Amino acid sequence: MRSGYTLPVFACAGAIAALHWLRQRQSIQVALVDLIEPAQIAEVPIEQVAGLSANMALAITRSDPGDNLDLTKNTPIWAVVEWGKTGGEQVTIKGGEGIGKQVNADNQAAIYSYAQRLLQANLTRLLAPEESIIVTIILPEGRSLAVRTSNSAFGVVEGLSLLGTTGISQPLSSPDQLDAFRSELQHKASLYESLVFCIGENGLDLARKIGINAEKLVKTANWLGPMLVEADALGVKEILLFGYHGKLMKLAGGIFHTHHHLADGRREVLATHCALAGLSKQDIEIVFHSPTAEAALKHLKALDISTGNDWVNQVYSAIAETIDSRCQEYMQSHSSRGTAATICGSILFDRDRKIIVKSKTACNLMGNLC
């Protein structure tokens, strides 16, 4: 299956093409982008370039994520570049229409660290020391596409995120991609005894921000079961599962491939642990019928405020412990190492990227991962 590039790469290519027009008053058909991660140069087709004024230009590219079931496939990405004030910040990056806003970060544009680095690195080298530019990224279809994503669950509204830790987009649901994840795991298992599994980019990004060693992070996508078994077979001593609660809690129900097309079980896991914690029948029913895990968490938080109880901690601590024990059982059932099987801990975070709970094992593992 063919890989492609992530959205930040196309945004950067458009900005390079628009800046070229400002300098040369000429269009280019291909922009060369240094991906940084990985260390390679991408040749990105430019669909259109136009001067909007003497000091402003627009370039358009189209997303090509490869053979990936990605809703951004073929969506246009616009980059508007204008000259800034002499002596100002060399590259100022803004989010325009269709770029999401982070509701818990003063509505900042959802242009995350890799995209920022990519744009800064590629554009700064094209500027003289005294020059500065303002780059505005626009996704004309971003607002409508965002409705079909889980962005709002992570506090991003009104558009898509320029998210990612690499310039390469891989087909995450394909067996070939599992092979790629296993290959990365095999490499890191040869270097470290303790590793962190993250399902997606939000986990990878937050893990770095709380001080976890980036070299110990391994992306799993939805393939948690096979990756846990592989880690155990490789002799990894400790695995920390670090992820969004709406994904990781599925493991507490014995679901080890977390794609929603295969199985869900979130409301059953939540309602069961609420019942075990002693919530009222009425509150258990509200949790069970909540449309999302985030809505259920919101109800538990409201209960804590109104009653002075600590239901969030009680329920989620129990879920985290169940995740740990289910993972241990799963690995041991596939392991030839017996009681020496890999130790597993879990950390769950919410849509605001705030940690809800760390299991007891996770707390013990953290010292080996930072």
Curated annotation (Swiss-Prot):
NCBIfam families: cbiD (TIGR00312). It comes from the Bacteria. The lineage of its organism: Bacteria, Bacillati, Cyanobacteriota, Cyanophyceae, Nostocales. HAMAP family: CbiD. SUPFAM superfamilies: CbiD-like (SSF111342). Belongs to the CbiD family. The keyword Lipid biosynthesis does not apply. The gene is cbiD. This is Cobalt-precorrin-5B C(1)-methyltransferase. GO terms for molecular function: cobalt-precorrin-5B C1-methyltransferase activity. It catalyses: Co-precorrin-5B + S-adenosyl-L-methionine = Co-precorrin-6A + S-adenosyl-L-homocysteine.
